[in-house]
Structure formats: structure tokens, C-alpha cells
Swiss-Prot record:
It comes from the Viruses. This is Uncharacterized protein L324. Residues 1-118 are annotated as: Disordered. Residues 35-46, 94-110 have a biased composition (Acidic residues). Residues 47-63 have a biased composition (Low complexity). Residues 82-93 have a biased composition (Basic and acidic residues). Residues 1-11 have a biased composition (Polar residues).
Amino acid sequence: MDYIVSPTSSEPYEFYRDRTFRGGANGNQTNMDTSPEDITDSDEQNDTTTTTSEMSSTSSVPSIGENKVSKNNKSAGISKISDSKLIFDSDNKDQDDEDDEDDEELEGLDTEGGFVLSNSDITTSDLYNLQMRIFRSETETDDDTDSETTENVRRALNNINSRKNIFDTEDRKILNMNSTEKWTRKTIKKNNKYH
């Protein structure tokens, strides 16, 4: 059994190292034999275990609280973690504290449809005001009023939404007049479908 000092804990923890056995079919005989290397390894391990236990007892960490065990916990074998064993501040937090922090982060944010929208997202009113400014700058006249600008924006948006391709109705009329497709188009029959 070996001991290792953890960087996050003041006490060492134990682990078992599997030793590799030398030999073949006679495994029992090789287990009984110990080499001089194994003996010196075990002596060094005993020295390290004593030093780690001394270091843990003479550590410079002040003990704030003691390991207090209540009567109910003694019977169950559960001991309370003392404050001296807490290495990081985050070890002392409860689950309720973490939930409160999450709620505080979400308080200032707008939620729409279950999604959290940050303050930098563009809302529909901002988009409408931007479009209104664009159309107002294009048709800048003294007679222009807000209601006319609103109508211009509404009309332009309706045109954009009603288009199914990039051409408007006037462009389609011109293309139909100049196109030769309707004069060269033939009726499709079963016989000449693939010709």
C-alpha cells in the first residue's frame, strides 16, 4: 500500500500498487521469494509514509473547526467535514447558493419564447425605425409626414414579401414582350416529349 499527498487535500490518500510477478508456471514459488530490490523499496515506502503523516500533523494550515460528530452521525458512521479540510472557497458553497446566482444572472435579461435575448439583439421596433429612416432619406421632401413615410415603408415591405423572384411586375412584362419562348414553344405530346 502506498500513500500519495494530494495537492487539493491536506491528508494523503492510499492506493494499492500491483506488483508484477516474475516467473511462469510456478507462480506460488515466485511470490514467496523477495528480491533485495523489493525489500529496499518497501523500506523507502515506509519512510515516505511517516514523513507524509508528520507533514500533515505539522501543517501550517490553521484548524478553524474541529471534526465534530453528532450523536446521530456517530451511529451512522458519517462525519462532518471540518472547515480546515476545505481547501477552496467553492467547496463551502451549497446548491441553493448556486441556484440563486443563476437567477440573479437571468433577472436583467429579456426572455421571449423561452429564449434568452441579450440587450444587443435588434427588436422589431428597432428594425422598423431603421427602415423608416432609410425611406425618409430617399424621399426627402418638405411635404413628407410621418404617416406618408410609414405608408411608404409598409408598401415597400409588402412589395418585398409579395415578390417570388427578383423581378417586379414591370420587369416581367418587358421580359415577356421580348422573349421568343412563347413563339418557339411547342405543345408537349407523348410522341415528341423526348425530342
